[in-house]
Amino acid sequence: ERTKYAYIGRSDQQKGLPQPPLELPHDLSRPVIELPRDGLQGTPSLDLRDAILQRRSIRSFVREPLSLAELAWLLFATQGVQHVEGRHWTMRTVPSAGARHAFETYLMIHNVEGLEPGLYRYLALSHRIEQLDTDPTLAHAIAAACFDQQFILRCNAVFLWTAVPYRMTWRYGERGYRDLHLD
């Protein structure tokens, strides 16, 4: 009720406060891996109707590693940047209220060609990944946070999304929390 327009004061954008960054800053002391930009050029098209009708959750994973090109394509498909408008907004492969794109993508890598197992962060603006941690116990902590679902330890990569709420609330005030949950 309190986030209805009638109750909302001026947003930080309306107050003239600076916009939050489009992406969390990269720690220059951490290793960064360039991702292939061509993605899966040979991947056949799939009709949307067929994709919806054929969709199944399968938790039986093959042991062959995910290629770096496959990982790059999945990252681009889920948070990829298609266009940057100055420092103001990005056009991505996914929608976001007001092009605010509050989500940050993290990866728990288990079995990807050329990558050491560990925690990474997707740097969407430059289509790279930043290595954050290679502690082998981290995967078990993430599985525990996912209600001890053991497939979290057996899959090639786990996508983890966090949000920077201020990217939304800067523009929309308290109502930004609603938009964040819709995104």
Predicted regions and their residues:
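N-terminal accessory segments that position/regulate proteins before the catalytic core
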Residues: 1-166
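Short pre-catalytic strand/loop immediately N-terminal to key active-site residues, enriched for Gly-Thr
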Residues: 174-183
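Short acidic/His/Gly/Ser-rich catalytic and metal-binding motifs that mark active-site loops
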Residues: 167-171
